[in-house]
Amino acid sequence: MVKQLKFSEDARQAMLRGVDQLANAVKVTIGPKGRNVVLDKEFTAPLITNDGVTIAKEIELEDPYENMGAKLVQEVANKTNEIAGDGTTTATVLAQAMIQEGLKNVTSGANPVGLRQGIDKAVKVAVEALHENSQKVENKNEIAQVGAISAADEEIGRYISEATEKVGNDGVITIITIEESNRLNTELELGMQFDRGYQSPYMVTDSDKMVAELERPYILVTDKKISSFQDILPLLEQVVQSNRPILIVADEVEGDALTNIVLNRMRGTFTAVAVKAPGFGDRRKAMLEDLAILTGAQVITDDLGLDLKDASIDMLGTASKVEVTKDNTTVVDGDGDENSIDARVSQLKSQIEETESDFDREKLQERLAKLAGGVAVIKVGAASETELKERKLRIEDALNSTRAAVEEGIVAGGGTALVNVYQKVSENEAEGDIETGVNIVLKALTAPVRQIAENAGLEGSVIVERLKNAEPGVGFNGATNEWVNMLRRGIVDPTKVTRSALQHAASVAAMFLTTEAVVASIPEKNNDQPNMGGMPGMM
């Protein structure tokens, strides 16, 4: 395919147009008075959302150079979402501000490499200051506040807080899943999660979220390595007749077996998801036994003289639902015998009391939390399918925010935390282009507050200047147009979300500014010839 090139200023300006188009579509959603964006869906009803990463993913521009600029900002949103689960709109606003300000300086003759050094230096200081200002999440109310701010809905914050309280939040495990329902409520169901994901992305059932969701699946539990498809074919034939999906938990599924599972999944013959067994060595065997007891399965192992070729469907476990991501597998409401589960829990508690090894005790406590902690299910209801999708997205963001808050604490919300570190960053000693790079970050730190104010119908510059001179923690409440102590009022953001947004925005901005040439494919022209007209008198 023939390529075309642009260099220097031409290249950067073309990409900037793409950055601005995407960022302008996303930033209207930031803050309590942010608006929604309607996304056209080819085969379903339009999706109405204010989720930054969802909007960013939908944007594809006709001009290849503009599209590359948009894709760079998409990467900011995706990375922030991947690490922190929220804050994608903030990251987009920060990236646009840094790119716009940086490009002005490059056009004026600044050296992009020096600017990059200054940006990196300023962001490092800002992140350290954010951690210094961070406060731990200590109670149910603070979790509810984080969820409510993220979802812009106090009711959602309350339900997430209740769900977190039900599963416990001791730092070992917090499992909450979201299901569709006719009303909003939370339930605690028996289940477990382990840190192993699907062995092939072709196994997913939802390509948008890259998740495999299995309803009422059979569960095969084995410590064997499955290489030959023939070894599991008799068992899979029985599963196919039942018209139910299957989760295969094994030492590893590889070669011919993995290939055939993927091919049959793509053809629609059956739905199967293969994941590696959790843990290692003796601990792996114990965790497989935990899973088998929870789901009512029989572990297929040489220790019991069992072979995969002889396995029957009654050796499989079952559960009401299984959700598999690229990193984790969550089993909800296994059909194991309650007495057997209680006996296993008692056994684990006894082992925890008897062991003298701190490491073994920690691992046993993890297993106990997985087995006895349960899975909180938030059931989401709405009046229409469009509203349901939008509400699920908001709850997912809020849930990710609360997890991030538990990990690294909270800071003042509404963009206040970024302006609070302004003074610390400005004290950085630097010269020349490095100093200019620091100033680029300083201006960007005020961008989220500025946009929140503008979305509320106010002059952003006035709000920013007043905030710079306010006491630490005091900020602008965009919902009421009041100046309040953000932490006391419960207007908070997870430190991890704010930090990730700033770091990823700076990373992409630095790459953008140091770009000197852009190579793009030339779109192929449509060479279809027009139809020939008929001869006179011909039909």
From Swiss-Prot:
InterPro entries: Chaperonin_Cpn60_CS (IPR018370), Cpn60/GroEL (IPR001844), Cpn60/GroEL/TCP-1 (IPR002423), GroEL-like_apical_dom_sf (IPR027409), GROEL-like_equatorial_sf (IPR027413), TCP-1-like_intermed_sf (IPR027410)
Catalysed reactions, as listed in the record: ATP + H2O + a folded polypeptide = ADP + phosphate + an unfolded polypeptide
CDD domains per record: GroEL
Subcellular location: Cytoplasm
Keywords: ATP-binding, Chaperone, Cytoplasm, Isomerase, Nucleotide-binding, Stress response
Listed SUPFAM superfamilies: GroEL apical domain-like, GroEL equatorial domain-like, GroEL-intermediate domain like
Conditions for induction: By heat shock.
Entry superkingdom: Bacteria
Enzyme Commission code: 5.6.1.7
Name of one Pfam family that matches: Cpn60_TCP1
GO molecular function: ATP binding; ATP-dependent protein folding chaperone; isomerase activity; unfolded protein binding
GO CC terms, sorted: cytoplasm
Positions annotated to bind ATP: 29-32, 86-90, 414, 493
Keyword Cytoplasm assigned: yes
GO biological process, one term: protein refolding
Positions of transmembrane segments: none
Xref: PROSITE patterns: CHAPERONINS_CPN60 (PS00296)
Role: Together with its co-chaperonin GroES, plays an essential role in assisting protein folding. The GroEL-GroES system forms a nano-cage that allows encapsulation of the non-native substrate proteins and provides a physical environment optimized to promote and accelerate protein folding.
Family: Belongs to the chaperonin (HSP60) family.
Assembly: Forms a cylinder of 14 subunits composed of two heptameric rings stacked back-to-back. Interacts with the co-chaperonin GroES.
PANTHER family: 60 KDA HEAT SHOCK PROTEIN, MITOCHONDRIAL
Name of the protein in question: Chaperonin GroEL
Gene that produces this protein: groEL
